[in-house]
């Protein structure tokens, strides 16, 4: 079945700006309404580290082409089982679920397999383009900024994996994300997300360099962590194999810079509560274990009262 990309522009009158959203895959069985964004979810400030934010807007452009190849060690199946378990424990066996920062749609697809009506939201056209190649008519993909997202209907749950939350660099922007989560959830709806920990940034990633070489491509990851600002920067250099009429392999070079912020649990809890959400628990990533001093990633669970 052919999937169609539809460009849906609208005017946000409150801020006199032109917001361009993409709705991808119009074959969704129950298309959601596309409506004007609520001003309460559109109060993103342009002050602060605007340069970094502009860089983030361009992130995952080249990397999207080889993301699944280099991220094949990510335990999406384990994550999806955990998320489904938590949703069902809270009486959510079906209904609309948002995958916020869905990337290429791997986790989104697994949650659709579990019976949920999935809405994948991401700000990267290239990542969504890769997700669209899965040709899964059960999933509605929306190109939206996490800080302003609006699924169109109240949903039963919002999930955000793969440290997507760490890409929100300013606390006021993260509060905007959480506020939009709160606005999107039904009463009693669940919010599940993961974040990288201070231990991962300070000890494991630090100022290290990682490299990997495969037939399809290679990458060099140069990491820098500023402990004072709590900002992690990593510069990616990619060499991606391209088809050639000659026998010799041709590799095209791409460069990207990514930024993430390290958040303390106490700060997250405060921002959640200020956004109308109730902090429930934090665990060592995708387990029911307590957070340890050497936990690399944690899972946070909250709900809308």
Task: Locate the predicted segments by residue.
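Class I SAM-dependent methyltransferase SAM/SAH-binding core
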Residues: 98, 105-148
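A short glycine-rich, Lys/Arg-flanked "PGG" loop and its adjoining helix->strand segment in the class I
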Residues: 175-187
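A short acidic, Gly/Pro-enriched loop at the edge of an enzyme's catalytic core
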Residues: 150-157
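SAM-dependent methyltransferase
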Residues: 192-271
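Conserved class I S-adenosyl-L-methionine
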Residues: 53-93
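C-terminal lobe and adjacent flexible extensions of AdoMet/dcAdoMet transferase-like proteins
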Residues: 259-305
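Short hydrophobic targeting helices and cationic amphipathic motifs
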Residues: 13-15, 28
